[in-house]
Amino acid sequence: MPIVRLLIYLFPLVLLGCLNFGDDIELVGSEITGKEMIQVSELTGLTFPNGTKSIGYYFQGSGIDDALSLKVSIPEGTKDEFLKNEIFQNGNKSKASIQIGRSRSWWKLDELQDRVDVNLQLPKGKYAECTLGKEEGNWVAYISWTST
């Protein structure tokens, strides 16, 4: 009987060890292509104004649940356009809590001034957060997304 019990406990661990998870990907600046921006738009529902510049992208695919973070610079004069996104219109106004990118050198969320924090529960167990604020005189958005 103890051997059967041991096998019952070990089986899930062995099974988890056999699962094939993805890779973690970090891109900075010009390494971030339209492909990543389209991915973020599709996952979060965000649309970015023309002239938006990518600063940092981190996709965490090595865990059980995928997650990503993105930092972009929003052109001066397009802040109101960006604020028309659903997450700002219908999301909960509360401080960002996921911060998948917080271990990245480009993730400086705590330095933002005049910030607007929102989050939104998405269909099928997905969740997005966005924080918009001023960083070194520029409008910057920090976006986190996770699938649970």
Feature annotation, model-predicted:
Residues 10, 38, 80:
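Short glycine-/small-residue-rich flexible loop motifs, especially phosphate/cofactor-binding loops
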Residues 92, 100-148:
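An acidic-aromatic pocket/loop used at catalytic or ligand-binding sites
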Residues 26-55:
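N-terminal "mature-domain start" segment
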Residues 47-51, 55-114:
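Mature extracytoplasmic domains of secretory-pathway proteins
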Residues 15-17:
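C-terminal motif of bacterial Sec signal peptides marking the signal peptidase cleavage site
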Residues 19-21:
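Bacterial signal peptide processing site
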Residues 2-12:
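Sec-dependent signal peptide recognition
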